[in-house]
Amino acid sequence: MAEEQKIALESESPAKVTTPAPADTPAPAPAEIPAPAPAPTPADVTKDVAEEKIQNPPPEQIFDDSKALTVVEKPVEEPAPAKPASASLDRDVKLADLSKEKRLSFVRAWEESEKSKAENKAEKKIADVHAWENSKKAAVEAQLKKIEEQLEKKKAEYAERMKNKVAAIHKEAEERRAMIEAKRGEDVLKAEETAAKYRATGIVPKATCGCF
């Protein structure tokens, strides 16, 4: 930046810039030195200089801007070749696909984990229900068996009671039959005795029923 400002200032004021001699220009050959002339007097020198100035005015100094400055241009560095847009786009697409695949992989893993948890939870609950069912069935069957045992015991007791009742009824019936038989025997014996008495006395007994 400082070199550019210096070049600009030198180009704006060419009168102050001296033209450098080319580096490769060969030096001129030395001219032959003439024999020294007699030294002029100071008055002659002053007069000659004044006349020379009048006859030959100093020419206007013309400067060639093209030769005034020698600008050394730095080689322009070529920019690195940019990657094609398609390659960058493909890279972005691949990165997006990888990110999406990774996200989907995490989602699938989470889904499988949640499904596994749900399956295990359901299986555990089903196992608990099965165990509860078996426990309740076992309790009911034990209660039923106990009731059956109680019923069997009561049935035996009732059967024994019934047998005892039947035996008592049979005994009472036998007693009643025996009493009837005894009464019948007494009545028959009494009738035979009364009939023998009537035969002996010749008395006719009164009819006791209306069948005669």
Curated annotation (Swiss-Prot):
Residues 23-41 have a biased composition (Pro residues). Residues 45-54 have a biased composition (Basic and acidic residues). Transmembrane segments: none annotated. Pfam families: Remorin_C, Remorin_N. It is found in: Cell membrane. Belongs to the remorin family. This is Uncharacterized protein At3g61260. It comes from Arabidopsis thaliana.
